[in-house]
Swiss-Prot record:
Origin species: Tetrahymena thermophila (strain SB210)
Annotated region (Disordered), positions in chain: 1-110, 281-343, 783-862
Coiled-coil residue spans: 59-103, 144-260
Biased composition range(s): Low complexity: 80-89
Protein known as: Probable beta-tubulin polyglutamylase
Gene: Ttll6a
GO MF annotation: an example: tubulin binding
Cysteine disulfide partners in this protein: none
Length: 1195
């Protein structure tokens, strides 16, 4: 059944019930008239004439006419009601019920009128009472009609004599009236019951309608889905039909071409594929199901069957081929249709945002997200699948760096600069020194223990007038650890505290101290966007305020207004009604401002002062916030990934001047009172609205990122903006934010950027805050810019010099983006030029020329910025002169580059070249700093000197028969040992080394030379004593002839090789002289290997080795069995061991590079240069002790 049918059903039932009630009432009225009529006849008596009967008949006719009129009126009213009900259809509200009740009361009044008319007609003498009753029970219109009828009746009768009789029967009529009233009451009760029944029926009717509506909605949805499916199928069929027709046309064209070639005279037959057409009256469009009926006949065949009989065979073949093609197309289309049907339709859910509340403990946050915004809540701390992340803790930069551009978090990294008391005090005190009048809203503060001495002076200055200080921990909340003091003895100089002057004259309300908790929304840090919520909290102390004295200095409930401290006081009054915000010890901000205004204070001026104080406080930390934000999200032009609700604590002094006490980056959102829940819930809701946390904004950001990625894929380059383009993009983004935020402010007011900032120059404050931040972090140090001469043509005309360090410098500058001043090339010492300098003196900065031989210092020409930079570099590097070595120009990089060249040459068969420096000096250097680069510069000169010495030594060692000169000396009965462990340094080589040193190493090398000379003298004395001991032993032993050694025409002598890598501490107890001699050589080398005895290699092994491969013995060749050596006595052996061990412990062996070992120093024919070792701790070039002292010798 439809809604209309159900409604008509109930309306017809109600109309039938009303008709039945009217009939019953008419019957009752007729029953009541008969006794009244008899009563009237009895009252009239026998004196009445016959005319009265005629009059009675007229009355009956009138009554019948009245009854008919009343019935017609009732019928008309019912018809009208039905019409109204049919027009309204579904108006079954309470208004219909009230109308029905009024209709029932009208009908009751009409029924009463009919009853009284019948009574009054029988009782002609009760006219006055009848009129009174009519006026009391009928409406005004019916009374007038009845009065006219009565007048007519009285004129016809003309009898007033019966009035006396009517008065006599007044009591009887009263009884009749009571009975009629009782009957009417019963009828009213019955009508009420019927009304209740009708109301129940109406409720059932409403429920049925709701059910029908829900069923209809389901049916409509199903119908819509069916229609969509049908339309999709129709479109698929159309597409298939079009494709098939196009295939048929192509087939026909191909057949035409083939027929024209073979038999051009024969006419082609037209064959059509006629799909089964299904007529749709709604769309009136031809549709097909995919079934084809191919007759193979055309119009030409029907008209010319007799003439074209020869063409039937060819047409049949063509039709068969076309049928086959059509069947193949059908199979393909059927497969596609089946594949489409098998695909599951994706049901797209309504997009909602995800709020991560895993790191918050406040239920009000979850309520706002779940109930107000209908968001999905997430409780996984490590998950990155969220849109808004709400946390109660500080945010690290790494977390912000991992976020996507559409995600948001409720904290800024680097907010410690405002939230920590020590950082806030440091920033505000710096600003106060520069702007003393503008930043005088923060109490004077000292940071202990750094400023303990300054704070101590405050007590010495104010001995006569003792001042009160409030002491706070650096990082605490809820008033923990705060106390007041007058004495310095209460403080420990080593503890970390923030000490402030106590405001001893605050503004009081009801004798209580109070402060404001203001909620400030920081919506962006670069540029700043600050909003202030119109409502806040006012927190009162619970004890009456008095000036600080010895008795109340420890009463924190008097001096502190923190809720966590005062809520446990028995005097604390909770506000249990949010509508009464001016009651208790926690009130609303607006109620207190209204109270101040009622007291006659200028609240508008106070509110402006508070806003300026908030802006200046945030500006002091703006550079820190901007740096952290940009480093994590450099391409976020909207500046909307972070937001933070800050809790500012503001106190008023006796002059209504606002003072900043502290800033809370995680204000409490606990809802202990209805006032808390009302204010904090609205604050969170409006802040999330203001930050545009919507699906629309999220999708816009995602689409923008997709466009950027598409451009990058197409162009193959990353989209880079110039500084001007970045400023334009930022300006556009901020304008877009302004348009949205101005429409969705809610309870917030934008206080920065301000429109009327004429009084305060905020840009000047921000510039100075940036300057303070750069000085604190060292970001203001700029690199020296290139000096450009007045005539740029001179630079272009100059020939280009090939200078490897300079080219490396250019590469370094391009990598780091810095610009260094042009640097003169280092000094280059060659053999032809000789020794740099004059008369062996080291060149000074004034003697250096501009041709690239030495380094030029320009201390006098540097400006202020350059001087600062040089001072910082000197302090950082620890060097004594302004001398910088490029990283690319370091010896290590040069060594590696040369080594790579050698490897490349070896790969193509070129003879391998080896560097003189040992690899351990770079690989085992923990500090990673290179050796002295100037040693490489004098390598050629030293090599030439070594070659000359080598030739001299070779002439001494060789004779005409290529025998060793030591064999001639062995024939003598007594010979002196020719094994020398030390050779005096050559003066010429010392001059070369001293003059090749750079000027910045002057003092270091002087110290090294002095210590080396001292160590050399001690070593000489020890070795002389060792030689004497050997001579004494030789004098006591028999003589043994020396083995003959043969020398090749070129290169080192061929003889058994003795390895001298054994420590003197492990000298074996043996009578063999070669072991003792080799042990002494092992003491020089300072390195100990696994074999405790001297290893002797064979001649074949030494012949196969090249000069550069002799590294294990460092080119040191000892000839064994030159003479017989007896073993030491035990006492002498112990003394020798102790002496050598002490020299090893004191690092007296192998330190000086000028010390050369043995007479056979250059026997190997190859020079190994001495490489100094760099020590980072001393930050200078020095020679470091190593396991292998022999690596510092030139063998």
């Amino acid at each position: 059944m439809s809604q209309k049918d159900i409604y008509n059903k109930y309306s017809n039932q109600s109309a039938d019930d009303q008709q039945e009630e009217d009939d019953d009432e008419n019957q009752e009225s007729s029953c009541q008239l008969s006794p009244e009529k008899d009563l009237g006849e009895s009252l009239q008596g026998e004196d009445l004439d016959e005319d009265q009967g005629v009059i009675g008949e007229d009355d009956e006719e009138q009554e019948e006419s009245y009854d008919e009129e009343d019935e017609e009126e009732d019928d008309e009213e019912n018809n009208q009601d039905q019409q109204n009900n049919s027009e309204s259809n579904l108006q079954y509200d309470k208004t219909n019920q009230k109308n029905q009740q009024t209709e029932m009361t009208d009908n009751q009044n009409e029924f009463l009128a009919e009853d009284y008319l019948s009574q009054i007609k029988t009782n002609e003498k009760s006219e006055l009472k009848y009129q009174l009753d009519i006026q009391s029970n009928l409406s005004g219109e019916n009374v007038q009609d009845m009065d006219e009828k009565l007048k007519q009746y009285i004129e016809l009768n003309g009898k007033n004599e019966n009035q006396q009789a009517a008065e006599s029967k007044k009591i009887e009529n009263d009884e009749i009236m009571k009975k009629s009233e009782e009957n009417v009451h019963e009828k009213v009760v019955d009508n009420n019951q019927k009304l209740n029944i009708q109301q129940n029926n109406i409720n059932d009717y409403q429920e049925d309608i709701k059910k029908d509506q829900s069923n209809n909605l389901v049916d409509i949805q199903q119908n819509n889905e069916i229609i969509k499916e049908v339309n999709s199928e129709d479109q698929q069929q159309k597409n298939e039909m079009d494709n098939k027709q196009s295939d048929i046309v192509l087939a026909q064209e191909e057949s035409k071409q083939s027929e024209q070639v073979e038999a051009p005279i024969v006419k082609q037959k037209k064959i059509e594929l006629r799909p089964k057409v299904i007529y749709d009256p709604k769309n009136d469009v031809d549709q097909y199901t995919g079934d084809y009926s191919d007759s193979g006949e055309s119009d030409e065949e029907a008209n010319n069957e007799d003439d074209d009989e020869d063409e039937d065979d060819e047409s049949e073949n063509e039709s068969r081929s076309r049928k086959n093609k059509a069947q193949l197309l059908k199979k393909k289309n059927n497969k596609k249709e089946q594949a489409k049907k098998q695909q599951v339709k994706k049901v797209y859910k309504k997009q909602t945002l995800v709020l991560n509340v895993a790191d918050t403990k406040y239920p009000v946050v979850k309520f706002v997200g779940k109930k107000i915004f209908k968001w999905k809540l997430a409780y996984d701390m490590e998950s990155m699948d969220f849109d808004i992340f709400w946390t109660d803790n500080a945010v690290q930069p790494e977390q912000l760096g991992r976020m996507q551009p559409y995600q948001k978090i409720n904290h800024f990294p680097g907010m410690f600069s405002l939230a920590r008391k020590n950082h806030l005090a440091r920033n505000l005190m710096k600003m106060r020194k520069q702007f003393p009048d503008q930043y005088k809203f923060f109490p004077q503060t000292w940071l202990l223990p750094a400023e303990y001495n300054d704070f101590k002076n405050q007590f010495e200055k104010s001995r006569s007038q003792q001042k009160i200080f409030i002491v706070k921990p650096e990082a605490s909340c809820q008033g923990r650890g705060i106390f007041l003091t007058r004495s310095l003895d209460d403080l420990n100089p080593s503890d970390h505290y923030v000490v402030q002057r106590y405001l001893n004259k605050p503004y009081l309300i009801d004798g209580l101290k109070f402060d404001f908790r203001l909620y400030v929304l920081l919506a962006g840090c670069d540029p700043l966007r600050i909003y202030l919520y119109y409502e806040g909290l006012t927190r009162f102390a619970t004890e009456k305020y008095q000036e600080v004295n010895r008795d109340n200095i420890e009463d924190m409930c008097m001096h502190l207004t923190n809720y966590a401290i005062n809520k446990d006081n028995p005097n604390f009054k909770f506000n249990k009604d949010k509508e009464k915000m001016d009651v208790g010890h926690k009130r609303s901000l607006t109620s207190v401002l209204q109270l101040l205004e009622d007291q006659g204070h200028d609240v508008n001026k106070l509110w402006k002062d508070i806003k300026r104080v908030l802006i200046k406080t945030i500006i002091s930390a703006q550079p820190t916030l901007a740096h952290h934000y940009k480093s994590c999200q450099p391409d976020n032009f909207m500046n909307n990934m972070c937001f933070e609700i800050l809790g500012f604590d503001i106190i008023l002094d006796s002059h209504l001047k606002p003072w900043v006490l502290e800033v809370n980056h995680t204000p409490s959102f606990s809802t202990d009172t209805p006032l808390d829940s009302y204010i904090k819930k609205n604050t969170i809701r409006d802040s999330l609205k203001l930050m545009n946390c919507t699906c629309k904004a999220k999708n816009e950001i995602i689409n923008q990122r997709k466009e950027i990625m598409q451009k990058r894929v197409l162009t193959g380059k990353k989209v880079k903006y110039t500084p001007e383009e970045k400023l334009e993009e930022i300006k556009k983004a901020q304008q877009k934010r302004d348009e949205y935020e101005d429409k969705h402010l809610g309870g917030f007011e934008r206080i920065f950027p301000m429109e009327d900032d004429e009084d305060d120059n905020f840009t000047e404050y921000m510039q100075y805050a940036l300057k303070c931040y750069e000085e604190q972090t060292g970001a203001n140090i700029r690199r020296n810019t290139k000096k450009v001469t007045e005539d740029p043509k001179k630079i272009t005309n100059q020939p280009k010099k090939l200078n490897q360090p300079k080219d490396l410098e250019k590469i370094y500058n391009t990598k780091i983006g810095a610009k260094l001043p042009p640097r003169k090339p280092n000094s280059q010492t060659t053999i032809n030029k000789g020794i740099p300098g004059q008369n062996g003196q080291r060149p000074s900065s004034s003697q250096l020329n501009e041709e690239g031989e030495t380094i030029q210092c320009e201390d006098q020409e540097q400006n202020k910025d350059e001087a600062i930079e040089n001072a910082i570099t000197r302090s950082a590097s620890g060097r004594m002169h302004d001398f910088r070595i490029k990283k690319q120009n370091s010896p290590y990089n040069i060594h590696q580059k040369f080594k790579n060249k050698i490897q490349n040459r070896v790969a193509i068969g070129v003879k391998e070249l080896k560097l003189a420096e040992e690899p351990f000096q770079f690989e085992e250097n923990i500090n990673g700093k290179p050796s002295n680069p100037n040693v490489k510069k004098i390598q050629a000169y030293i090599t030439s000197e070594k070659e000359q010495l080598e030739i001299k030594n070779m002439n001494i060692l060789q004779d005409q028969n290529y025998n060793s000169s030591r064999a001639v000396q062995a024939k003598k009965p007594q010979i002196e040992p020719q094994v020398l462990f030390v050779q005096e340094p050559q003066t010429k080589k010392l001059q070369i080394l001293n003059q090749a040193k750079p000027p910045q190493q002057k003092l270091q090398f002087q110290l090294i030379d002095n210590t080396a000379a001292q160590m050399e003298e001690e070593r000489r004395q020890w070795l002389i004593q060792a030689q004497r001991n050997l001579q004494y032993q030789l004098s006591q032993q028999q003589y043994q002839p020396q083995q003959k050694l043969t020398l090749l025409p070129k290169g080192p002598p061929i003889h058994p090789q003795t390895n001298v890598m054994q420590s003197i501490a492990d000298i074996p107890n043996s009578s063999n002289s070669k072991e003792i001699l080799a042990a002494v050589g092992g003491a020089i080398s300072g390195q100990y290997k696994t074999d405790k005895r001297v290893t002797i290699k064979q001649k074949g092994q030494i012949q196969n080795q090249s000069i550069n491969q002799l590294k294990d013995n460092n080119g040191l060749f000892l000839q064994p069995k030159l003479f017989e050596i007896q073993s030491f006595q035990s006492s002498q052996q112990q003394q020798a061991q102790q002496a050598i061990q002490s020299s090893l412990d004191q690092n007296l062996i192998g330190i000086n590079q000028n010390m050369v070992g043995l007479n056979d120093l250059f026997v190997s024919g190859k020079s190994h240069k001495v490489q100094p070792h760099y020590q980072a701790q001393q930050d200078s070039y020095s020679y470091q002790k190593h396991n292998s002292y022999s690596n510092y010798y030139q063998k």
